[in-house]
Amino acid sequence: MTAPTPENGCNKLQNMLQAAVQSVQWTYSLFWQICPQQLILVWGDGYYNGAIKTRKTVQPMEVSAEEASLQRSQQLRELYESLSAGETNPPTRRPCASLSPEDLTESEWFYLMCVSFSFPPGVGLPGKAYARRQHVWLTGANEVDSKTFSRAILAKSANIQTVVCIPVLDGVVEIGTTDKVQEDLNFIKHVRSFFIDHHSLPPKPALSEHSTSNPTYSTDHIPAIMYTVADPASTTIPNQDDMDEDEEEDDEDDEVESGSEDETNQGHNQHATSIIEAAEPSELMQIEMPDDIRIGSPNDGSNNLDSDFHLLAVSNQGNPSRQIDSYTTERWGPIEEPLDDSLQVQLSSSDKSYFIIH
């Protein structure tokens, strides 16, 4: 699998620069990107949209103005690289369609010389925009001194009057024109939209499992304590028909014993019904809670569950269904099978209800 080539990213960036500058009909657009090694803003890419003095091409047919501007931007970059390499390397034969310095207008020279500039954060228009994370709008760039605008001399020669630097997610977009334009916030939003729309927005912050901001309100921190009212229709009372079928399958040969068990079960069921009716006024489990829990309201967002509030259901963490059942009040029917050693059943004659003690 081949790795993505840098040209793909450069083409995408240049397309955004082209769309932005052509939408407002300004002279040029640049992108200053941060250099990780030196932590300074350097030329990333650009698009020239201004006047052209001499057009050179090897294409036999006439091209559109958009294609000509794109080709011009590439030729200007190649000319700068050629001039930079010529200082250390012997001159090489260049294609006949390559530009020469005498082929450029003053605005093209301004655009070409921008490639050689760099700006530490906080220095120059791009550096200030990057450090402050706010746009910088300079009207009269050709009239100020070099302390205000380091490229003021070049701007005066090229008649660049307005320069705007707009910080984006990973750099600064600079856009300039030969017209004098006053600051316009809608213009800033318009230009920035070409670059923000091509970046995925960061996800909304979510509470981590270590967050101290109301952890019970996070979906990852649903309290393990649940209180429900036992529904008489859903309580576990042995069904007489099911018991009869089980007894017939298990003891088909012993009809006398099965009949006696049926009578016994009917007696127990009648006794359980009377117990249920006696315990009807009190369906909720009464739990003694500390005062700090009682003070907290269910809607005040407080987390008073950190107090000494212990329930027996802690031992049932391995079985979630049993853990929930431990906080519900259920009515138990007769227990026909012998109890194991881990359970003890006590019958209170005062309230006629069963309690299971683990």
From Swiss-Prot:
InterPro entries: MYC/MYB_N. It comes from the Eukaryota. Keywords: Activator, Flavonoid biosynthesis, Transcription, Transcription regulation. Residues 230-271 are annotated as: Disordered. Residues 241-264 have a biased composition (Acidic residues). GO terms for biological process: flavonoid biosynthetic process. Belongs to the bHLH protein family. Non-functional truncated transcription activator. Corresponds to one of the seven genes studied by Gregor Mendel in 1866. The wild type purple flowers (A allele) have a functional BHLH protein (AC E3SXU4). This is Truncated basic helix-loop-helix protein A. The lineage of its organism: Eukaryota, Viridiplantae, Streptophyta, Embryophyta, Tracheophyta. The gene is BHLH.
